[in-house]
Each structure stands twice: as structure tokens, then as C-alpha cells.
Design a protein with these regions (language model features):
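Periplasmic OmpA-like peptidoglycan-binding domain that tethers envelope proteins to the cell wall
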Residues: 14-84
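Periplasmic peptidoglycan-binding/tethering modules of Gram-negative envelope proteins
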Residues: 1-10, 82-84
């Protein structure tokens, strides 16, 4: 795995939600999603110092929240490899 072998790489983990529920609950849920991915990767051998986790709640949708399909797409975690 790239993050285990390369010291100069990191991973930005971003949690997102749909717009169902309150802003504060969605922010907490999105952070929990990102943290769950971070914890999984740490168990797989990735150093915690290489991982950054963020929760954005419903603030960055990639689809409409007007349909069940769109809301499903917005409930996600995105990861970006970073160079440190």
C-alpha cells in the first residue's frame, strides 16, 4: 500500500451526508464516517500521522437532495492522496 511504503504521502479523508436531519447532527455523522475510515486504515498498518479526517456534513453535495438516489450519492467518504 502506497501510504505504508512512502513516507512523504498522506491521505485526506472527507466525510459527507445528505440534508436529512439537522446541520449539527449531519456534521457529527460526517466526522464519524471519516474517522471510521481513518481507524480502519490505521488497523491495516497506515501511520495515524499520515491521515487527516474531516467532516463536512451536508455542505458539499455532489447530487441533488431532492431524490432518494441523489441523497444516497451524497452520503459518502472521499479520499485524496496528499504529498507532504
Amino acid at each position: 500500500m502506497l501510504l505504508v511504503k512512502k513516507a512523504n504521502y498522506g491521505l485526506r479523508i472527507e466525510g459527507h451526508t445528505d440534508n436529512v436531519g439537522t446541520d449539527s447532527k449531519n456534521l457529527i455523522l460526517s466526522q464519524k464516517r471519516a474517522t471510521a475510515v481513518k481507524n480502519y486504515l490505521k488497523k491495516k498498518g497506515v501511520e495515524g500521522s499520515k491521515l487527516e479526517d474531516f467532516g463536512y456534513g451536508e455542505s458539499k453535495p455532489i447530487a441533488t437532495n431532492d431524490t432518494p438516489e441523489g441523497r444516497q450519492k451524497n452520503r459518502r467518504v472521499e479520499m485524496t492522496i496528499t504529498f507532504r
